[in-house]
Amino acid sequence: VSVTTVSIIINGKAEERKISAATQERVAEAMRDLGYQPNLSARRLRSQENERPVIAFFWPLDYRVSILASFLNFIQIEIAESGFDCEMMIQTYENDKLEQYGTTFLKNGYSGAIIGACSAKDQQWLEGICPRMPVILINRESEHFSTVCTDNDEVGLMAATKIRQKGYTEAAIFASRHSYFATSQRVQAFISSCERLGIETDEKYILKGSSTRNGGYEIGKQYAALKEPPKMIFCDSDAIALGALRAFHEEGISVPGDAELLSIGMLDPEAASYYVPSLSVVEMPNKEIGQQVLRLMRKKVLNNDISSEHVKVHAKLMLRESFS
């Protein structure tokens, strides 16, 4: 295969130049074997669409991927309403291994990058390479990059304050066994707020499992087996809370009669609203975060601005049947 033919195939003009499917497959196989990555910057310079910004959106491929759809939906709405004509490239990555995927997009020259739910290790690596493009972190703090985030201390205090107002002096905690950065910060903020407000959170009543409905179901079963556990329960995710509610139903634990649940709300609000009983949450403002991320990225890209800028959005307390 000639160099010219390879170039035509790489640049997506094989059909136009009537190059056979067999030849296209041979070139594709060679590219896979060599680990070849097309130079997107050069391609865009040759393209008639070189003025159209391309934004990379990185998100970890674990249980949190269910949250990605929510952010994408709100970002897409904001793109349409703002008229920002950009291309969004989605790249999932393994937690703590952003470097494995990140090197490629940094070399290929995207117009900007949105990084969601990165670990402390991933953030440290990213700050060490100083990419020359606008970078926005979701729900993280950084001096190097722009951020759009909620205040984890505010979230913890909001939950603890409402629990104390109802007269509770002790609370159980249902939490993820994996110490994901923002989640663990919110739990710690809740515990610290409880200490200040006179609410006991005994270690033996901090029950952990996977951050899924099944994990919550198993935690709910553990709680049901305890002798006289706290009636008040704080859950670090609505996935865990919904699973626990199923276990409570099977164990004959009435909510809110025998136990009350308040959770961090990360999923689609309808998931909590239409469950029986409906779930009370400190709702993370995914819609506002998505809107602010896109607005900030648009401003940075159009002004060729890589300086850091920080936007705070506020969580909301949504009281329903499980705790009011």
Report each predicted region and the residues it spans.
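Short beta-strand segments enriched in small/hydrophobic residues
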Residues: V3-S7, R46-Y63, E170-R177
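Flexible loop/turn connectors
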Residues: K221-S324
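Conserved hydrophobic residues forming the short capping helix/wall of the S-adenosyl-L-methionine
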Residues: M31, I79, C194, F248, ...
